[in-house]
C-alpha cells in the first residue's frame, strides 16, 4: 500500500532511526526518555507542548520533526485551528521560510488527523 506523503516520510526515517538507535543505544534511550518527560502534562498541558514543538519544527525546517509533532498533535486531539494558529506564530517568528514549511505542517496534521487512530500511535 502506498503511503500518503507524511506517512511516507515517517516510514523513510524508521530504518535509519533504528540503525542509529543500535549504534548509540544509550544516547537514543536518553533522548527518548527526555522527550517522554518533556511532553507530559505539567504547568503546560501536553497539547500546548506539542504545538510548541510543531512551531519549532517549522522554524527549523525539519520534515521529520514536522511529521512527529503533527502526528502528536493529531494523536492528542489538537484542533486544526490550533495548528493553524501555531503556524501563524511560527510565521511571525521566522518570516518567509515559515510560509513554506507552515503549509507542510498543516498538510501533515490533516493527513494524520484523517488517518485511523492506530496510525497516530508511536511505533518504535
Question: What do the PLM-derived regions correspond to, one by one?
Answer:
Residues 84-110:
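C-terminal structural segments of small proteins and small subunits
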Amino acid at each position: 500500500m502506498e503511503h500518503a506523503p507524511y506517512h511516507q516520510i515517517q516510514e523513510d526515517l524508521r530504518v535509519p532511526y533504528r540503525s542509529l538507535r543500535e549504534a548509540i543505544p544509550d544516547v537514543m534511550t536518553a533522548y527518548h526518555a527526555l522527550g517522554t518527560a518533556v511532553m507530559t502534562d505539567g504547568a503546560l498541558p501536553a497539547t500546548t507542548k506539542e504545538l510548541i514543538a510543531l512551531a519549532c519544527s517549522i522554524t527549523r525546517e525539519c520534515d521529520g520533526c514536522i511529521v512527529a509533532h503533527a502526528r502528536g498533535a493529531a494523536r492528542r486531539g489538537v484542533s486544526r485551528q490550533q495548528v493553524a494558529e501555531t503556524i501563524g506564530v511560527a510565521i511571525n517568528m521566522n518570516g518567509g521560510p515559515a510560509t513554506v514549511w507552515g503549509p507542510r505542517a498543516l498538510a501533515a496534521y490533516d493527513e494524520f488527523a484523517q488517518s485511523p487512530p492506530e496510525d497516530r500511535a508511536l511505533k518504535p
